[in-house]
Regions:
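Alpha-helical interface subdomain recognition
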Residues: 1-106
């Protein structure tokens, strides 16, 4: 939650600066990196939660599936689909190079 709010506040700050006419440097690349990391961290948490809830002992008590199979499939599918965020818009390595050039003047 804190990381998400920090990303949102940083995005708003950059947009405000851009609207004011400030030149934008490496900030979009930083946002892209942090955003894709955050999505993957969220997916990992959801995946672990589904894994835990899907234990056989949980469903044995109720006689029903511990997790809705459609939801579990959605979480698993999303986890692997969102891995592509590190590639879309330039791989993480490319984004690191852009940041290095902007910040360090390389």
């Amino acid at each position: 939650e804190i990381r998400l709010q920090a990303l949102e506040m940083t995005s708003l700050r950059i947009l405000t600066e851009a609207d004011a006419g400030s030149q934008i440097g490496a900030e979009p690349s930083m946002l892209k990196l942090k955003g894709s990391e955050l999505v993957q961290a969220q997916d990992e948490l959801l995946f672990r939660m589904v894994d835990h809830l899907a234990l056989a002992q949980d469903s044995a008590n109720t006689g029903e599936a511990a997790v809705n199979p459609a939801w579990a499939e959605y979480v698993a599918s999303g986890r692997y689909h969102h891995r592509g965020y590190t590639i879309a818009g330039g791989s993480s390595e490319v984004q690191h190079n852009i940041i290095a050039k902007q910040v360090l003047g390389l």
